[in-house]
Amino acid sequence: MPFTIDTARSIFPETLAADVVPATIARFKQLSAEDQLALIWFAYLEMGKTITIAAPGAANMQFAENTLQEIRQMTPLQQTQAMCDLANRTDTPICRTYASWSPNIKLGFWYELGRFMDQGLVAPIPEGYKLSANANAILVTIQGIDPGQQITVLRNCVVDMGFDTSKLGSYQRVAEPVVPPQEMSQRTKVQIEGVTNSTVLQYMDNLNANDFDNLISLFAEDGALQPPFQKPIVGKENTLRFFREECQNLKLIPERGVSEPTEDGYTQIKVTGKVQTPWFGGNVGMNIAWRFLLNPENKVFFVAIDLLASPKELLNL
């Protein structure tokens, strides 16, 4: 029976993803807008004690600058309302603009808002604000998970804000400029204990070099990529857009893996290692598994990227 994207998702079923992440995000979305904003603020303050967040580059922020300045010029009450509108996914011009941005621009926008709050330029969370019992329980959960999981929770919480893109009709996606690939002389080839497959090694090397055109050439025409806690992205065009919008300047540090032949001439390969993002650099390495299914032509038919469970989660199983 030939593989489908759906059946491919079940390769290496023993892989233990960080279930605490989607569970925490689901609980977060049930909170009031005020509690969501306060929780993000308190969580960032908490993270700031142990994690250094890198300032977004100017190229990222040029697209958000007008919106940020618009919010700065509002009254404190209007500023609070604008942020609540984002959390409530209200249909406003700011929420529509926000919805069109790539995840990195959204993250940069919230970074700048946090800086403005610190400087007193934007209405902060009211002094003495008390989180609801549910929000406080979520904050305690976030405090107890590892840094890579904290980042993923907070990222997904803010990325999903703004007006629902499915209701926008046709709209212009806004993403930061694509950085040029690294020169060949500057690239360092990865080595993975237990894996010598050229497609997998090139996948890692090309992604580390921001060489997205050569990266996408490794995929089958009907291939798919499944980001952590998301549905598969199918087709080369959609996958290439994902790489360009969400994977610039990542540092993949694969460590070891296993390769197994499977039915119909396909090969399944699992690699584990770490990924560092430009937002947090070497401060935080997210524990990742890559689950590849390669077709008989050695092209990527499917790859799932899993944020792995922490040692603490594994002990609780």
From Swiss-Prot:
Domain of life of the source: Bacteria
Pfam families associated with the record: Carot_N, NTF2
PROSITE patterns: OCP_N
Cofactor (UniProt): 3'-hydroxyechinenone
Binding site for 3'-hydroxyechinenone: L37, Y203, W290
Biological-process GO terms, alphabetical: light absorption
Name of the protein: Orange carotenoid-binding protein
Native source organism of the sequence: Limnospira maxima
